[in-house]
Amino acid sequence: MRRNSERPVRITEVCLRDGSHVMKHQFTEEQVRFVTRALDEAGMHYIEVSHGDGLGGSTLQYGKSLVNEMKLIEAAVDECKQAQIAVLLIPGIGTIHELKQAANIGAKLVRVATHVTEADVSAQHIQFARELGMEVCGFLMMAHSASVEKLVEQAKLMESYGAEAVYVTDSAGALLPHEVRERIRALRQSLNIEIGFHGHNNLSVAVANTITAIEEGATRIDGSVRCLGAGAGNAQTEVLLAVLDRMGYKLDIDLYKMMDVAEEVVAPLLPVPQEIQKGSLVMGYAGVYSSFLLHAERAAQRFNVDARDILIELGKRKVVGGQEDMILDVAAELAKIKMEV
């Protein structure tokens, strides 16, 4: 089929980073080795490994990791024969010190992530990553919450800092296909670097959104095997690969092996099956950061309020990633209102 780029499509598997939210950041080294080895043997291009909130995310606010993420990254690098290991870094959570550590133990790609209106805070990290010899992408989170014009403006900043690609990152799983098309098309017409798309499946359109992004020229896409990612997960990698194969894309990833990875390697790790439940559905509907789900559910239980009310209120306040402390504040306020009624 016709698409607006001649570059090959490359996939980053995010189940060992985005999926860390689902696992409450309790991945073991053995699990990371097992999953990485299977993905590598299937031909996966990139495998992202780090705390769910990126390098340096193991804190009381974001959730403590069971195993130091550098050990997990090192283990993943050790298992790879052809895939490259990627990491996520959110300025303000991760630092250039942690980025240097990750590079020294073999991480080859870093995605530097900021809120969609705050690309300026990524300059130092992008430039430093280039100095380290890493492949560097910008990652504009909560892309649904800004105008197309603002998105283009911020993407151009990341390009000027040295990013080799910029992702439209649908952190809330709130974008619909026509909105993805509009954003990717605008970036393709404005940038001279690659464009990526990272979706979440909270409204059950992650695969459709990813296909739309590819049609408009995105060449870097994300997936999570068995939807092992925050909220309702991301575009389900093995499903996405099957769709792409039907459409004529040859990505040199073994579809049968990826089905086996999903069924035999990743599925047994899931605390519960990844499906669109009311919490993740509300996040997509309200436009709330997908990693907020478990935090909101815990706060709801603590304050005896409905998690959906918490998420809707967070959406109204346009709370962004990094403001997890607001979840408890909102829950407490809702509980107080409930008592007064």
From Swiss-Prot:
The family this protein is said to belong to: Belongs to the 4-hydroxy-2-oxovalerate aldolase family.
Site residues (Transition state stabilizer), renumbered to this chain: R17
One of the protein's GO biological processes: catabolic process
Residue span(s) of domain Pyruvate carboxyltransferase: 9-259
Catalytic activity from the UniProt record: (S)-4-hydroxy-2-oxopentanoate = acetaldehyde + pyruvate
PROSITE patterns assigned to the protein according to its UniProt record, in alphabetical order: PYR_CT (PS50991)
Full protein name: 4-hydroxy-2-oxovalerate aldolase
Keywords from the named record: Aromatic hydrocarbons catabolism, Lyase, Manganese, Metal-binding
Residues involved in substrate binding: R17, D18, S171, H198, Y289
Highest taxon of the lineage: Bacteria
Listed HAMAP family: HOA (MF_01656)
CDD domains tied to this protein: DRE_TIM_HOA
Binding site for Mn(2+): D18, H198, H200
Cited NCBIfam families: 4OH_2_O_val_ald, PRK08195.1
Residues annotated as the enzyme's active site: H21 (proton acceptor)
InterPro entries: 2-IPM_HCS-like, 4OH_2_O-val_aldolase, Aldolase_TIM, DmpG_comm, DRE_TIM_HOA, PYR_CT
